Amino acid sequence: MAETYQPSLRAQILTRRTYNRALNEEGTQFETWAHTVARVIEHQRWLWKRQLRRPLNKTQEAELEELRGLLLARKVGVAGRTLWLGGTEIAKVREACQFNCAHLEIQTVDDMVDALWLLLQGCGVGVTPKSGGISGFTQPILDVQIIRSTRQDKNGRETNLETWNPETKEWTISVGDTAEAWAKSVGKLLAGKYTAEKLTLDFSEIRPAGTRLTGYGWIGQGDETISVAYRAIIEIMNRRAGQLLRKMDIHDICNWLGTILSTRRSAEISLFEYGAPEWQEFAVCKKDYWSKGQPQRGMSNNSLVFYQKPTRAELRGIFDLMLASGGSEPGFINGAAALNRAPWFSGVNPCAEILLGNRAFCNLTTIDLAKFKDNPSGMHRAIYIIARANYRQTCVNLKDGILQHSWHENNDFLHLCGVSLTGVVRRPDLGPYELRLLRNAAIMGAYSMADELGLPRPKNVTTLKPEGTISKCYDTTEGAHKPLARYIFNNVTFVKHDPLVNVLREAGYTIMPHPNGSGDWVITLPVAWDDVEFETVNGLEVNTETAIDQLERYKLLMDNYVEQNCSITVSYAPAEVDAIIEWLLQYWDHYVGVSFLLRADPLKTAADLGYPYLPQQPVTKEVYDAYVASLKPLDLESLKAQSEDAVDMGNDCAGGACPVR
C-alpha cells in the first residue's frame, strides 16, 4: 500500500493551481493529486510500452507502482511539464511539450519558428542570437493594417492563408486558430520579401480570449498579445529593411514572441558571448526597459558567456553593470567550464541548470532529500527509480512537422537527463561522500534504463534546479536555497472571484484587499522550517548566510553531485562584491553560472520598506504559533476547485522570467 502524505494548505493550493488539470469544460472540477499521479504513471507506461513494442511485464509494472508510491508521498517528482501534460492526448502528438528545457541558436527564419512553437507549448527556451541569416523587409512597409478578431466561438480556420498581389502591392497574412498556424505565421512574416506597399495581418479567425485550450488545458489569450507582438516585429523588420538583422534585433523579436503566451507561461534566457559584437548593448538592454518603451525585454533572463577566464577588472565591470540595473543582470556563464562538462555546449535553459547544444532538450526530475532522513537505502533506491523514469521521458518522437529534424537527431544522441535534488539545506549531514553516492545511484538508474532499452546512455544525468514550485508543493526547502527565516507569513494573491477566498476567510486566515485596487485579495499562509539552522537576530530566527557561504554550497554540489549546473540564486550585499570576485577568480574552473540578487533585509517589515505588504514576512515563533492556533483545518481536495491561474505565488527565479513549472 502506497505511503500517504498530508500536504500543507499552501502545498495543496499550489498543486491545484499548477498541476491538477480541469475535469470539465467550465473549469470548476479539478483532479486530485492521486488523479494527477495516475495520469503521470499512464504516461510513463505509454512511453515504456512504445519503446518495447509490447506490454510491460510484472517486474516493469511493479516498478511503475513503486514510482506511483514515491510520487503520492511527494518524495520524488517528475517534470512540471509532465505533471501538467503527461498522459494527455496532446503529449502523444506534440511530444516536445514534455520538455522543461530547450536551447537553440537563432540564425534563420526556421529557428524563429522553432522558438515560437516551443514557447507556445510552455517550454523554457534559451536562445543565442546569431546575425547573418535573417534580414529585414525588402523595403519599408508603411501601410500596415491589423484586423482583430471578433469571434465568439473557437471554430476558426486552422491554417494560415497568405496572399500577395503584385499589381496592388498588397501582402496579406491571415493567421489560423491553432498553435501550428501561429508558429508558422511568424515564419511567413519574417520570410516574406515582397516589394509590398501594404501589409495586412488578419487575426479574425482566432478564438476569443478566455477560452480554455482543450489540449494544453490553460486559458487562451485570443489575438490580444499576438497582434501587439507582430506589430512590434514589423517595426523591427521595417527599421532593418534591406539589411541583415542585428543580434539585438533577433533578441527583441524573440522577446516579443515570448509575450504571446503571456508571462504566466513563457520563459526565456538570451545569451551573448562576452567581447563579441553588441555585447555591451545587450548587457544594459534591460536597464529601465519599461520607461524606454521596450516592455518585451522583461521576458528573458540575460547572460554573458565567457570562453576565457575574466580578469578582476572585467568581473568588477560586470558587477558594476549589475548594480546599476538592480543587482541581477547581466548574469554571466563560464562557457569553458560548460564545455568541459558538456562538449556539445551551445547554451542553457532559462534557469541555466542544463548545458544544452544547439537545438537540444532536457527533461527534469527531482527527489526531496528531507523525506529520507535516517533512510539512506530508501533515498538511493528512490533516486535510482526516478532517474529511470527521467530516461524514459527522453524517449520521444520530435518529428512533429514543425521542429527542424536536428532536434530529434540531437535528442536521440544526447538523451539528456536532469535528476535534481531539493530540500538540500534540510540535510546538512550529506557531505561530499554521500553526495557522490547519490550521483552514482542516479547515473546507474539512467544508464540501466538505457541499456535495457538498447538505446544510447544519457550524456549527462545529474543537475540541481531552482525547485521553486515543486518544492512548495512538496513542503520542502527550494533546491539548494536556504529560506528567509524559520517562521514566515507567505502573503499570496488570489483573484477576486476565487471561491477559496470565502472558504479561507471562514477558516480564520488573514485576508486584505490587494493594494493595487484590482479587487484581488492577499491571504496570509503560514510556513515554518523546524529542521533548518538559523541565527537569532532581534528576536527573529533569520537567514544570515553570506554570499560566500552560498557559493561554497554551490561548489560542494558542483564538485560532488552535479554533472551539468547547479542553479541557485546567490543573495548578496554590494559590500560583498569584492569577496565574490575573489572567490570567482580562485574557483573559476568550478563555476558554470549562478544568479545574483541583492539581499533583502529579513529584519525589515513592509512598513519599514514602504510597502503595503511583503510576499514573505519573517515573524517570531510566538506570532506564528498564535496565528496557526487560530486557524480551522481545511482539506483543499475536498473543496470545489478554483479557476486556473487563480493564485499568484510569485516568481520562481531571480530574474523573474522563469515561471515554467
Regions found by a protein language model. Give the residues of each.
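Extended catalytic cores of very large enzyme megasubunits
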Residues: 1-661
